[in-house]
């Protein structure tokens, strides 16, 4: 169990490094590269650099809020 | 304030010989108690440490008290003291009552359910002497430390809980919710009287208050082993309760 947990943790860290690198390149470096360069085909149009994180944030906060709300309602009912 | 604390400590510890009191709050620990006492005595006698154990028994229905009394006959009343209380009254009051019975100038708090191994106590003491600090805490989140017997979900919750608490409260300690710690007795008394939290947040508040009062906290990596007998669980209500009380602490500490 310990070894597989370590593996999952390792994958999570790798994923985080990849996302950080990719996003930084996309948002900070690609605007300075000519638009018909071959590397541009690996990145979405730039406005998605704002849209995707925003959607993730809203979904995440909603999920946490719903979880907290549900638990609070449940604990109130038990009383 | 902190400089005053430091100077009176160094003068007292150089004159008197250090004695360590281990406070063990118990509730339904009849299987674990003989093992933990045996481990404490072998580990500490190996290092020639002057110690005593105060068992704070909260009227367990499984006869933990009788087991404690038999152990007292074996190890002697010098080494084992028993405090029998009428029922569960919370961790803070168990420690406070334990302190009143203690004769040592240092106090070690640990769980009696075998999740904390007494072999780390000599390391705590060594760390304290080296740093000349008032508190030493065992940490699961430094290299060399860890958790055994938890699934990934439980590990993640514990990590995230610690992360949230340390971001909000910035106490400068890596393991906030741990409960295996060494305190100078007067420091522990002072911290407990100020502490208003319960459960996991009780341990968090101890560290936050210590930081606020300018006490230095040393850290020793420990391996935590989840309880072998009995169950420990974490439901969603507990998670929300933790968040609420951390937030509460955040609001009330300036």
Swiss-Prot record, chain A:
Keyword Transmembrane belongs to the record: yes
Superkingdom per UniProt: Eukaryota
Subunit field text: Component of the dolichol-phosphate mannose (DPM) synthase complex composed of dpm1, dpm2 and dpm3.
Cystine connections: none
Record-linked PANTHER family: DOLICHOL PHOSPHATE-MANNOSE BIOSYNTHESIS REGULATORY PROTEIN
Family listed: Belongs to the DPM2 family.
Task performed by this protein: Regulates the biosynthesis of dolichol phosphate-mannose. Regulatory subunit of the dolichol-phosphate mannose (DPM) synthase complex; essential for the ER localization and stable expression of dpm1.
Membrane topology value: Multi-pass membrane protein
Annotated protein name in UniProt: Dolichol phosphate-mannose biosynthesis regulatory protein
Subcellular location: Endoplasmic reticulum membrane
UniProt-listed GO biological process terms: dolichol phosphate mannose biosynthetic process; GPI anchor biosynthetic process; protein glycosylation
GO cellular component labels: dolichol-phosphate-mannose synthase complex; endoplasmic reticulum membrane
Gene source species: Dictyostelium discoideum (Social amoeba)
Pathway this chain belongs to: Protein modification; protein glycosylation
Molecular function terms, GO-annotated: enzyme regulator activity
Keyword set, alphabetical order: Endoplasmic reticulum, Membrane, Transmembrane, Transmembrane helix
Stored InterPro entries: DPM2
Primary residence: endoplasmic reticulum
Residues that span the membrane, as ranges: 8-28, 50-70
Keyword Signal: no
From Swiss-Prot, chain B:
Molecular-function GO term, any one: dolichyl-phosphate-mannose-protein mannosyltransferase activity
Keyword entries, A-Z: Endoplasmic reticulum, Glycosyltransferase, Magnesium, Manganese, Metal-binding, Transferase
Record function comment: Transfers mannose from GDP-mannose to dolichol monophosphate to form dolichol phosphate mannose (Dol-P-Man) which is the mannosyl donor in pathways leading to N-glycosylation, glycosyl phosphatidylinositol membrane anchoring, and O-mannosylation of proteins; catalytic subunit of the dolichol-phosphate mannose (DPM) synthase complex.
Any one GO BP annotation for this protein: dolichol phosphate mannose biosynthetic process
GO CC aspect terms: endoplasmic reticulum; endoplasmic reticulum membrane
Enzyme class: transferase
Binding site for Mg(2+): 113
EC number per UniProt: 2.4.1.83
Subunit structure and binding partners: Component of the dolichol-phosphate mannose (DPM) synthase complex composed of dpm1, dpm2 and dpm3.
Protein family (similarity comment): Belongs to the glycosyltransferase 2 family.
UniProt keyword Metal-binding, yes or no: yes
Entry-linked Gene3D superfamilies: Spore Coat Polysaccharide Biosynthesis Protein SpsA, Chain A
The organism of origin for this protein: Dictyostelium discoideum
Residues that hold Mn(2+) according to the record: 113
Keyword DNA-binding assigned: no
GN (gene name): dpm1
Catalysed transformations (reactions): a di-trans,poly-cis-dolichyl phosphate + GDP-alpha-D-mannose = a di-trans,poly-cis-dolichyl beta-D-mannosyl phosphate + GDP
Pathway: Protein modification; protein glycosylation
InterPro entries per the UniProt record, alphabetical: DPM1-like, Glyco_trans_2-like, Nucleotide-diphossugar_trans
Compartments (UniProt record): Endoplasmic reticulum
Cofactor dependency: Mg(2+); Mn(2+); Ca(2+)
Primary location group: endoplasmic reticulum
Protein name, as recorded: Dolichol-phosphate mannosyltransferase subunit 1
Residues bound to GDP-alpha-D-mannose: 25, 27, 29, 56, 58, 111-113, 140, 227
Cofactor detail note: Binds 1 divalent metal cation.
Pfam families: Glycos_transf_2
């Amino acid at each position: 169990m310990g070894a597989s947990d370590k593996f999952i943790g390792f994958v999570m860290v790798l994923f985080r490094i990849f996302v950080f690198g990719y996003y930084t390149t996309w948002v900070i470096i690609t605007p300075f590269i000519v638009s018909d360069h071959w590397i541009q085909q690996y990145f979405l149009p730039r406005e998605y650099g704002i849209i995707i994180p925003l959607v993730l944030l809203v979904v995440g906060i909603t999920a946490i809020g719903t979880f907290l709300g549900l638990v609070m309602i449940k604990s109130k009912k038990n009383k | 304030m902190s400089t005053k604390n430091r100077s009176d400590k160094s003068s007292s510890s150089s004159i008197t010989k250090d004695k360590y009191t281990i406070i063990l709050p118990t509730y339904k620990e009849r299987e674990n108690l003989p093992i933990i006492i045996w481990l404490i005595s072998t580990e500490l006698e190996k290092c020639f440490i002057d110690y005593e154990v105060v068992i704070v028994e909260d009227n367990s229905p499984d006869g933990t008290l009788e087991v404690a009394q038999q152990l007292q006959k074996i190890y002697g009343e010098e080494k084992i003291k028993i405090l029998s209380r009428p029922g569960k009254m919370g961790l803070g009051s168990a420690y406070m009552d334990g302190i009143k019975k203690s004769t040592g100038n240092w106090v070690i708090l640990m769980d009696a359910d075998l999740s904390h191994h007494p072999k780390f106590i000599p390391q705590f003491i060594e760390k304290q002497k080296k740093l000349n600090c008032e508190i030493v805490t065992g940490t699961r989140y430094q290299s060399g430390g860890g958790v055994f017997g938890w699934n990934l979900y439980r590990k993640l919750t514990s990590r995230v809980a610690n992360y949230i608490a340390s971001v909000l409260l910035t106490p400068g300690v890596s393991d906030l919710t741990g409960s295996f710690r060494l305190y100078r007795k007067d420091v522990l008394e002072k911290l407990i009287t100020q502490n208003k939290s319960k459960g996991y947040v009780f341990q968090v508040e101890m560290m936050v208050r210590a930081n606020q009062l300018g006490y230095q906290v040393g850290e020793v990596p420990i391996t935590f082993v989840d309880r072998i007998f009995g169950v420990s669980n974490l439901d969603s209500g507990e998670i929300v309760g933790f968040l609420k009380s951390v937030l509460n602490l955040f609001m009330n500490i300036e």
